[in-house]
Amino acid sequence: MIFMLYEFYGEECPHCQKMLKLTEKLMKEFPDVKIIRKEVWHNKENMALVKECDKDDACGGLPFYYNTETKKWLCGEVKYSELKEWSGAK
């Protein structure tokens, strides 16, 4: 099973830059995990998509991760173990 995940980020966001290293590690370690990166601060379409995924503005910040399979999300800078568990990677 391939897990499709969205990673919403801001180009100038320092937390997003830190998390990029972890998402790259996750994709290398688990080839069945596909992360689609969407920059939102400079792209209106991506901003609309993050608002659709972050219903009720529950996170309201970046980075924001959305699992298209489970419909669950993850907000902010987290540890690798939490990212891995949330992603469904095995």
Regions found by a protein language model. Give the residues of each.
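Disulfide-bonded cysteines in secreted/extracellular proteins and peptides
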Residues: 13-16, 53, 59, 75
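A short acidic, often aromatic-flanked loop/helix-cap motif at beta-alpha or helix-coil junctions
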Residues: 42-46, 80-83
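Short Fe-S-cluster ligation motifs
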Residues: 43-60
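Local sequence-structure signature of Cys/Sec-based thiol-disulfide redox active-site neighborhoods
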Residues: 1-35
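Non-catalytic, surface beta->alpha helical segment in thiol-disulfide oxidoreductase systems
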Residues: 61, 66-90
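Solvent-exposed loop/turn segments at secondary-structure junctions
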Residues: 11-13, 42-43, 71-73
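Residue-level recognition of beta-strand->loop/alpha-helix junctions
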Residues: 37-41
